Amino acid sequence: MSITNATISQRAKKWLEDDRIFIDTETTGLGDDAEIVEICLIDSAGFIMLNTLVKPTKPIPAEATAIHGITDEMVMYAPTWKDIHGAVASLFFEYGFVIYNADYDTRLIYQTAKLYGLENDGFCYFLNERSACAMMLYAEHRGEPGRFKGYKWHKLVDAAAHEGVSVEGKAHRALADCRMTLGIIDALAKGGAA
């Protein structure tokens, strides 16, 4: 194992030993007006801490539903972000997050919190600082040159397949994506696939 891969393995092990929470969201889209429609948080043992649909402030576009399968009918009676913000923040402050594509999910958490006037609490302030990006660690492990911070970014399902991590449930649903992220970090902690 190279020094770089040993360091990557050590970081992955540390995230697992620190009992970080693995988080994933599904959203109404990619833009500045997108918001969260599903969130899942699991611990490093795979225990589900929170797994819920989230009722957005506007209808879910058909393009987003085509990706994750979440419809307006499914979220009709779901809690709003305001209802779950405190629980998510509490878990964040206690454990910190590991996220596959942290920049995206932290932006969507902030955007969704802002819709409810919750963007100025400590949670949103520290979100980027205490969130580790599994995608960047994996990109560094693979070492393929790319235009994003020097490395090629790999889709979650592709990274999982390369590391021999099976998909439990439907990809592009928050629980399945959390489990894939945990599986990738577990694989990296053990040295990762060549």
Regions found by a protein language model. Give the residues of each.
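Short gly/ser/thr-rich secondary-structure transition/capping motifs
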Residues: S2-T7, I23, P79
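Two-metal-ion RNase H-like nuclease active-site motif
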Residues: D19-T28
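Metal-dependent phosphoesterase signature
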Residues: A66-V88
